[in-house]
């Protein structure tokens, strides 16, 4: 599922700014965490791959799979979103340029109220839609087989403030 993630992590450089933490709450919006689904989709293995390919750049990396079986988008079946995020030393520009450069169908989108940069790639040929954000010290990757890239971008902007928090000193 997020095949470009490992490549993107290796392209990061150093960054700065306010420190943030990424969390995986039990519930975000109408989505509930689905640990069994995370295991079956290989989320922990993907998280480990991102950490390994990051060569020390990715840290505090977390993963979760969220499922919504009751909201409006779930009319034709449960909507699943895989999320992997953490802290990353690097520039948002480098991360997003890497994402859009690797995938010709990728497009830049708004990162939302927390700033930074974001991009998405439509799902094709059985691969899920993917969206990513990066700012001065965090990154997040979302994938969903049930949402198109524009819908997933909207979910990124709504979910990100629920998973990214300023670290209190």
Predicted regions and their residues:
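A short acidic-to-branched-hydrophobic micro-motif
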Residues: 63-91
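Membrane-interface extramembranous regions at the lipid-water interface
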Residues: 26, 165-166
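Short Gly/Thr-rich strand-loop-strand
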Residues: 92-128, 168-169
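N-terminal "mature-domain start" segment
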Residues: 7-64
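Localized chelating/binding microdomains
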Residues: 38, 43-51, 91, 105, ...
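Core hydrophobic alpha-helical transmembrane segments of single-pass membrane proteins
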Residues: 1-6
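Short, hydrophobic/aromatic-rich segments at coil-to-beta transitions
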Residues: 57-65, 114-121
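A short, solvent-exposed beta-edge/loop patch
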Residues: 116-163
């Amino acid at each position: 599922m997020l095949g470009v993630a490992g490549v993107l992590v290796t392209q990061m450089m150093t960054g700065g700014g306010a420190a943030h933490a990424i969390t995986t709450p039990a519930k975000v919006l109408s989505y509930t965490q689905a640990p069994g689904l995370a295991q079956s989709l290989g989320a922990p293995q993907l998280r480990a791959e991102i950490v390994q390919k990051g060569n020390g750049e990715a840290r505090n990396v977390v993963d979760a799979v969220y499922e919504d079986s009751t909201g409006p988008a779930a009319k034709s079946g449960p909507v699943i979103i895989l999320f992997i995020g953490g802290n990353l030393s690097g520039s948002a520009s480098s991360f997003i340029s890497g994402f859009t450069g690797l995938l010709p169908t990728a497009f830049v989108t708004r990162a939302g109220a927390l700033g930074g940069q974001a991009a998405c790639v439509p799902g094709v040929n059985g691969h899920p839609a993917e969206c990513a954000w990066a700012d001065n010290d965090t990154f997040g990757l979302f994938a969903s087989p049930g949402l198109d890239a524009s819908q997933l971008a909207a979910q990124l902007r709504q979910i990100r403030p629920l998973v990214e928090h300023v670290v209190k000193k």
